[in-house]
Amino acid sequence: MYRLLSAVMARAATTGGCAWGCGRRAAHQRAGLPPLGPGWVGGLGLGLGLALGVKLAGGLRGASPAPPAAAPDPEALPQAEPLQAQEQPLAPWSPQTPAPPHTRHFARAIDSSRDLLHRIKDEVGAPGIVVGVSVDGKEVWSEGLGYADVENRVPCKPETVMRIASISKSLTMVAIAKLWEAGKLDLDIPVQHYVPEFPEKEYEGEKVSVTTRLLISHLSGIRHYEKDMKKVKEEKAYKALKMMKEMMESDQEKELKEKGGKSNEKNDFAKAKVEQDNETKGRNSKPCKKKNDFEQGELYLKEKFENSIESLRLFKNDPLFFKPGSQFLYSTFGYTLLAAIVERASGYKYLDYMQKIFHDLDMLTTVQEENEPVIYNRARFYVYNKKKRLVNTPYVDNSYKWAGGGFLSTVGDLLKFGNAMLYGYQVGLFKNANENLLPGYLKPETMLMIWTPVPNTEMSWDKEGKYAMAWGVVEKKQTYGSCRKQRHYASHTGGAVGASSVLLVLPEELDAEALNNKVPPRGIVVSIICNMQSVGLNSTALKIALEFDKDRSDIP
């Protein structure tokens, strides 16, 4: 301090009072204040000297060192209020994020489901996967694993937008159902009534009718991506033989169980004979190696079509593969024709009509996939090449199949859609107990029709079920007491170039108490999207739904 005081005094003496720099004094003068002169500096020196004297006097009073400074009183200091749990600046749904109150009941289910998804992701080598789960209409978990864009290391998150592929069929069904409810569409008259551009058809010389109802459930006979009728028929014959063999084995096991599990040489010989005969028939009827959808050229179309009517030229002149109504053949092209029917029945362009539906359902991130527009949070899509290396999928244009597989969405929007369908399905059951309930987007009788399995159909992603109207449906069943119980659920999967998806709805098994004290929707909805093609996700979604259903049953 002596040195500081001496320096100040010396500077004042040599510079004529400009000890603090002329710049500062000039600034002081510009503010209209008195100039800083030697008197001001002298006053400063006097003050510093007095302070130093007091300090020295205090130090000379005792020989013992001064005690350490006391810690500040925490009561005297201003305290910052702690952040509440929901205000913590952590990524939503990360393992470190404090769970919102309505999700804490499902901590076990979330941990278990996250582990399951990690295992599925690792098994198939998927770059990224996003999941969303709602319970009784409330979203309780959504999370992204891996990368939406591998090259730029962009992680998946709940807002990630991906191709939903054939879940688009379920969206199109809502448009058809709304037109049917309004009396603008008859499901059972020939499609030429609405779309005369589609030619009348014959099968084996007989004139046949293709209707909207048959198109919805894939019973029209219109082809899928495979153009070779012979290959398709061989494949169907082989599948039928395989299914018959499985049914025979199941019947034999059932008969054995009813007899107390006892077997005999006669039964064993008969079983061996059946297996041998079926194996011989299988060798004779087994088709040559069938290309899967991703080996079909039409899946990779790059041509842009202006509307659904123009898209019909891809298949409208092809022969039917079988008589309408007689067999099931999954067909995305059938939904291209349905889009044209929606246009003619509604008076709107198909995409405009669908955007109105998305707006009503609050599905604000669901759009048709186009390459030119900037779509925020859109993922990139991947496949493994012949060398088992991860590569980007080629450019495709989905304008020829908006209705059957051309939309983009998020897990959150798919949950909203699933809950809207579940609400409409259940609201009629609750009406007597609660007259204040709003109507569903679709009427209860409409949803019952949509979720009722149709005869002669197949549900390829779960052999226990049947195809209904743009949904696969598994019905409730239990064969033996204290044994496996099959839950009723509806779902649709999707497979596109570089993408896989599933939307699954598991309705609650309602009792009288629930009908009197609860409101719809009641049940679990699961949506999963993935930026890797050929990933089967239905069984994973069902396992996740059942995990959340377990935790849900424990809520008081």
Swiss-Prot record:
Residues 249-290 are annotated as: Disordered. The modification N6-succinyllysine is found at residues 290-291. GO terms for cellular component: mitochondrion. Residues 249-282 have a biased composition (Basic and acidic residues). It comes from the Eukaryota. Its EC number is 3.4.-.-. One of its GO terms (molecular function) is peptidase activity. SUPFAM superfamilies: beta-lactamase/transpeptidase-like. InterPro entries: Beta-lactam-related, Beta-lactam/transpept-like, Mito_Ser_Protease_LACTB. Keywords: Acetylation, Hydrolase, Lipid metabolism, Mitochondrion, Protease, Transit peptide. It holds the Pfam family Beta-lactamase. Coiled coil: none annotated. Mitochondrial serine protease that acts as a regulator of mitochondrial lipid metabolism. Acts by decreasing protein levels of PISD, a mitochondrial enzyme that converts phosphatidylserine (PtdSer) to phosphatidylethanolamine (PtdEtn), thereby affecting mitochondrial lipid metabolism. It is unclear whether it acts directly by mediating proteolysis of PISD or by mediating proteolysis of another lipid metabolism protein. This is Serine beta-lactamase-like protein LACTB, mitochondrial. It comes from Bos taurus. The lineage of its organism: Eukaryota, Metazoa, Chordata, Craniata, Vertebrata.
